[in-house]
Amino acid sequence: CGRRHRGELVQGPGTRMNLDSKEIARYLGSRGGDLWPEAAALAADCQRELEGTVTPRTLGRRLSLSLFAGQSRDLDHHLRHCTEGILFAVTLGAETDRLLRRWSAQSMAKAAVGQAVCAVWLDQLCADYCASFLPTLDEGQYLTPAFSPGYGDWDLAAQRLTAYGVTPEDVIQEMPAAFLEILR
């Protein structure tokens, strides 16, 4: 595509996210249920701490999918009708890892709920980032679901390699999740 989308979303400390408690419950293993009261209280506490300290970032760009051909049978199948994609990385920042370690030392229950809160927040950042590309799509193009290293048979080790495609090496330490959104 001829248009260029710089595609960086940076949110500073104090960023608020409206997180779906059913999604948090799903990450904790609940099937269609709500968070139980203790988990809901821990989730609210974790979210408050995260909102006050983390710096969420999303960075990516559009590129040819030939770079990924042959890396995974499942990825090749996912890309079979595609000509280009959006390679992007998402992070809640290094402070998130520090909080998760601190929560692990305080309470494994809080650490588990905190991990679920982080996962839902990352999912929302991914969805928001991908939605930012919708106005740039040409007639007949659309987005497919994201496909990340670790999905299907795509080796999780590819995560570090995909990060090189979206950000300078010195920033990779803060980019724990890389995704490939597909244009069809």
Question: Can you name each region flagged by the protein language model?
Answer:
Residues 2, 10, 92, 140-184:
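Short terminal or interdomain "cap/linker" segment that borders an active site or interface and mediates
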Residues 34-38, 42, 114-117, 121, ...:
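Catalytic cores of large soluble enzymes that bind and process phosphate-bearing ligands
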Residues 8-11, 23, 126, 131, ...:
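Low-complexity, compositionally biased segments
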Residues 4-111:
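Active-site helix-to-loop segments that bind/position phosphate- or nucleotide-bearing substrates
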Residues 82-148:
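Conserved mixed alpha/beta catalytic, RNA-binding, or beta-rich assembly cores of soluble enzyme
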